[in-house]
Amino acid sequence: MAQQYQPGQRWISDSEAELGLGTILAQDGRLLTVLYPATGDTRQYSLRNAPLTRVRFSPGDQITHFEGWKLTVREVEDIDGLMVYHGLDGQNQPRTLPETQLSNFIQFRLASDRLFAGQIDPLSWFSLRYNTLQHTSKQMQSALWGLGGCRAQPIAHQLHIAREVADRSAPRVLLADEVGLGKTIEAGLVIHRQLLSGRASRVLILVPENLQHQWLVEMRRRFNLQVALFDAERFIESDASNPFEDAQLALVALEWLVDDEKAQDALFAAGWDLLVVDEAHHLVWHEDQVSAEYGLVEQLAQVIPGVLLLTATPEQLGQDSHFARLRLLDPNRFHDLAAFRAESEHYRPVAEAVQELLDEGRLSPKAHATILGFLGAEGEALLAAVSDGDTQASARLIRELLDRHGTGRVLFRNTRAAIQGFPERQLHPYPLPTPEQYRDLPAGEHAELYPEVAFQAQGEVADDERWWRFDPRVDWLIDTLKMLKRTKVLVICAHAETAMDLEDALRVRSGIPASVFHEGMSILERDRAAAYFADEEFGAQVLICSEIGSEGRNFQFAHHLVMFDLPAHPDLLEQRIGRLDRIGQKHTIQLHIPYLQDSPQERLFQWYHEGLNAFLNTCPTGNALQHQFGPRLLPLLEGGENKAWDTLVADARSERERLEAELHTGRDRLLELNSGGAGEGQALVEAILEQDDQFALPIYMETLFDAFGIDSEDHSENALILKPSEKMLDASFPLGDDEGVTITYDRGQALSREDMQFLTWEHPMVQGGMDLVLSGSMGNTAVALIKNKALKPGTVLLELLFVSEVVAPRSLQLGRYLPPAALRCLLDANGNDLASRVAFETLNDQLESVPRASANKFVQAQRDVLAKRISGGEEKILPAHNERVAEAQRRLAAEADEELARLVALQAVNPSVRDSEIDALRKRREDGLAMLEKAALRLEAIRVLVAG
């Protein structure tokens, strides 16, 4: 009831015990506000069902004041709803301690309270709790945490960038990989790892409006991140005073935000830890003028600690535009365009020297002199060793140069030339006659590029006169699909109406099973369509996608792509091919392009193929060429002299070749080496694949499902269907769907079946289930019969699980150093600890369940003996706890000191290292060591064993 809560009272959260002791701040209507001073968190609960337990101590309990002194309670007084404790301090002096002054770090022995209250859990739950602790501990210490759970093939350069960036405090970097190398995945990995580690809690993602859906799909499908998509309608309809404050991850279209000052004010007021901006190269900047979009992002970058900019490659942008992105990251470091140009020229000969070392294995006198001039006297010994053929010295030399690279810590840029694993492409053009029905269509935007849309727009026609009855591209498509029978074919067209009509055409005219995929469908409907296409045995041969509908999707299990029409921009063309042409594609991409002869379609095909070479290769110059030649291109597409057209194509080809030559000579191999990770990323790939092959997760999840009443049944090979049973223990179990869900632990299966949940240790279902076990009391008491002939019947053993717990903000990541692994002791009647001689699994195999009533009866009869032994258990385990805490402090200090030394040394030769980064690391070291000093032992679980 509402009146039981008073400001100043101390309560503990039933679901988030790690927050420490809570203080009631306010009771407002139906809401209760609680502050947790230990972590700085504030929570609001419904008054009717707040998951809180009142903190009351009894005479005999020892409690701690927030200044550190202890009080043994003699008497408890209730004054206006607030507890006041009277007793003796450590010097046996009488003291009074109001509950408002209790230490925020006090722990509770809830397991013993439940045991003596008769709340005894099933035996299997105790094992589940122990295993949950062990798995949680292992994952928190893993170098793969936040990297291995992505629904994607692990790729070395992506993992290297993600770890390098996500492990920084408030990273401020530019991701400028070439198209097809997965910048969005890199950004998602950084976001995911920062969220899991606690380095970031609130993330703002700014994207162009046409990419909102792609980001929504990518973040949800690949990382299970629930992103809130904001637009004008959602913002206006929200009842909240600031709609952005309710979203941990917000996805916002930059176009809307620039035009809505009220939304801008709310966005700034909401507070964010990490800003991610996609397509950052579209932010226009000149020395004397900036665009509204650039100005807005600049303001946000000044108040948000972490900034991630995704952009085209620096070579595509030009140096001035590249400088504009770097200004957003660090305006103090990049403040003068002329100085930046000079610095870039300074690094060019060094990069060329490194290229020579990599290609030739040795340095010419000129390259030797260049590097010596760059490194100074300290480089002499290294260069001498390189000259003697020392390969380790070569690697060290390259590392030294990387550390000194002007933008090496803020810019990551991988190229297809430097990354292996891309497929080849083959082009199959099909010129077809233009039907009479398309000759005199009304003019419209690109009407002759998409004549079927213009034809349909004229009005209703009889079924036998629909465009797909006479368009030769449809006849060609049916024949091609029959020729490629049992081969998966992806068909992409510009418009959703065309996609739906093509599905009708295939069904009516051929009976070929097809699935359709367009922006008018919900995400769930698209998932089902994609799954039907992906199914090898019973699925559709063909998936027909609209332009927008296919954004962000990956169909690399197919390698035949039909472009039923051509898009109006080369970036969209590359996006289409990119649905199949990705790292990991095992086959040559077959591009099938039907087009109508003597029409704008034919000329557009020639423009892309002969002018831009955009079919057979990626086209990094496509955007620049389209911009440069656009005024000549558009009129000539619709008509015009053949000679003028041929001249345009020839001019575009010459300009493309010139730009490509510039790109090649301007390649910065030093930067590519740094971005690729030089072997570190490959080690992460191998570790993730090794983790994928282990059975620990499926075995653990079966016990978790069993405990919570989740039924699992086979769906197909490597896949299970999960459904809530009638005996489901907790409705809050994060199943994801009340009706049930299909899961797989197999990465390959998950990549081809997007309708299945891909379960890893990072998945919300796994993490949520583990949290339910550990945050509540599940399995923290048990009584069992032990069958062992070496034990005299009636012998009582007491198994205690303790956890070394530190209450601290997640951003300190103290779980990496002091994870919640179980400290176990097994006490006999004489108080001897047998745990080192009897392993948990060995003991488990000898146990049998005891009826709850009998178990409770035994516990009550032995209460005094058990209570004494429980209190003695803490003394037994205390040395192990102190050792773990000391080791955690040593590890934290060693890691922080090593990183500090590296950054300080690096700052001396590379101004990209910010003072704020070094200061933040120093503070994190100090705060972490101070928090570890307060680590306390918590009794996690008790199991009473009776020999029989």
From Swiss-Prot:
GO terms, biological process: regulation of DNA-templated transcription
E.C. number: 3.6.4.-
Pfam families associated with the record: Helicase_C (PF00271), RapA_C (PF12137), SNF2-rel_dom (PF00176), Tudor_1_RapA (PF18339), Tudor_RapA (PF18337)
Entry GO MF terms: ATP binding; DNA binding; helicase activity; hydrolase activity, acting on acid anhydrides
HAMAP family hit by this protein: Helicase_RapA
Family per record: Belongs to the SNF2/RAD54 helicase family. RapA subfamily.
This protein's name: RNA polymerase-associated protein RapA
Organism expressing this protein natively: Pseudomonas putida (strain ATCC 47054 / DSM 6125 / CFBP 8728 / NCIMB 11950 / KT2440)
Higher taxonomy: Bacteria, Pseudomonadati, Pseudomonadota, Gammaproteobacteria, Pseudomonadales
